[in-house]
Amino acid sequence: MSLRFEEKVVLVTGGSRGLGRAFTQCLADAGARVVFSSTGQSTTGAQVEKEMRQAGADVVHLPIVAEEAERLVEQVVSKCGRIDAIIHNGGFVQDKTLRKMSDQQWQAVMGVHLEAAFKLSRTAWPHFETVGGGRLVFISSSAGLYGNFGQANYAAAKLGLYGLARTIELEGAAVNIGANVVAPFGATELNSANMDEDRKAVLRPEYVAPIVAYLAHRECPESGGLFEASAGSFKKVRWQQSAGLILDTSQPVGIDDVAAGWASVCDFTAPSYPSEMRESLRGLYEPHLLSD
């Protein structure tokens, strides 16, 4: 089987350099018509478009920032007649410890990562329905999964993408619209200054791109998934719930009861793996129903 993207149009935000360029190249190599966006603050996007087109790729560069999500999607449809998938990779950081972070720094980072993802999805939705479905891939970060010092805004936005994708999974299932999240790590010009050449070779961005392209393909059945990817390794991440502390609610439940049973709250020797909200909630209240 060879998964191809002929006659499909894919938008890649932040697609002119680093991981984004690798996504653009991978999709173009698979036959997609790729529209990639950049801030337009340099000539990089235009140069990448020229180089890739000379090599035979069907690519279009749009110097439109991700925050202008509605205009970006409408430009893609205007130029290409359709849109089949979106890879939301564009963004930036404005790092500061929480105590020193300004409202502007918080809002700017939330805007380019999370709010843009929402607006891209909402604007593309009717166009996806017109062509029989669509795929959304939101590029997250290990900072979103695990937190990172000085990146409260970035971490919150990047984990927020997962909640957005899970909701799109539920709302889009009936119309063949799916969404997934990938937290990649690759060597780029922004993070590789202190890397040795061996590490750079292992962490090439093109070793991450295939999972992003697969999740953007119409034949990929996955939706609502969260994945980590680096150096040709691809792993799915899921929630784990401890067996927990189950107190007798026929008696008053107090702070001291929770404190005394804290080891049970945090005991993962016999965990469950809820995959949806109802399943998680049942794990909390059903033990009481079964004991009645």
Predicted regions and their residues:
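Conserved glycine-rich cofactor-binding loop
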Residues: 9, 16-17
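Conserved glycine-rich Rossmann-like NAD(P)H-binding loop of the short-chain dehydrogenase/reductase
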Residues: 32-46
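Conserved amphipathic alpha-helix within the SDR
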Residues: 49, 60-63, 67-81
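C-terminal helical subdomain
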Residues: 72, 181, 199-290
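Substrate-binding pocket helix/loop in short-chain dehydrogenase/reductase
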Residues: 97-98, 102-107
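Active-site helix of classical SDR
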Residues: 121, 157, 165
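Residue(s) in the substrate-gating loop at a strand-loop-helix junction
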Residues: 141
